[in-house]
């Protein structure tokens, strides 16, 4: 939804999405400011790439090098081999990679970005579906249906439902 709020009518957000930084477990990087002059890998054309290229967020330090790679798996290989100090990626991408390849990285507590995911409708859509969808998504969150669905696929499902403070 972020960056497109004025382009569509939105139902939701129904889930929170986090862009994060991950490091090797023994890294001395614990917060975003520790990335100053460090080397970081991202997948090209992703939110983390834009965050580190644009540096419009005052929390984002000047890196030594930003390495943009065409394939997601490569950023984790670069991290594991020590070619970079950290990676920027979608949190679930990091978690899934660790599961798939039985490896461990440490995700920094401070996220790069937290955004809401919603359902977009055309601005001129007047069928009332957007409002019905928004109401249904909220009911599903309140009655626990969303939690039951998310916990089938993601660890720590409750944090993905923390959408009230996103400001939409």
Task: Specify the residue positions occupied by each region the protein language model found.
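Solvent-exposed, polar/charged alpha-helical surfaces in well-ordered, non-transmembrane soluble domains
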Residues: 20, 33, 50-54, 73, ...
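A ligand-binding cleft/hinge motif common to bilobed small-molecule-binding domains
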Residues: 1-7, 51-54, 78-113
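Short helix-initiation/N-cap motifs at beta->coil->alpha
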Residues: 66-77, 115
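Periplasmic-binding protein-like
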Residues: 15-23, 99-138, 156-168
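Ligand-binding cleft/hinge of the Venus flytrap
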Residues: 11-12, 48-69, 98-102
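Beta->alpha turn/N-cap motifs
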Residues: 1-2, 25, 43-46, 71-72, ...
């Amino acid at each position: 939804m972020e960056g497109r709020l004025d382009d569509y009518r939105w139902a939701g957000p129904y889930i929170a999405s986090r862009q994060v930084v991950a490091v090797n477990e023994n890294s001395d990087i614990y917060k975003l400011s520790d990335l100053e002059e460090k080397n970081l890998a991202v997948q090209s054309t992703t939110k983390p790439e834009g965050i580190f290229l644009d540096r419009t967020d005052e929390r984002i330090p000047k890196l030594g090098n930003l390495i943009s790679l065409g394939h997601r798996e490569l950023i984790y290989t670069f991290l594991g081999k020590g070619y970079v100090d950290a990676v920027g990626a979608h949190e679930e991408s990091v978690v899934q990679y660790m599961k798939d390849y039985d490896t461990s990285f440490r995700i920094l507590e401070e996220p790069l970005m937290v955004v809401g995911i919603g359902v977009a409708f055309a601005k001129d859509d007047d069928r009332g579906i957007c409002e019905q969808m928004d109401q249904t998504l909220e009911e599903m969150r309140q009655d626990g249906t969303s939690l039951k669905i998310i916990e089938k696929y993601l660890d720590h499902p409750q944090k993905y439902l923390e959408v009230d403070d996103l400001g939409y």
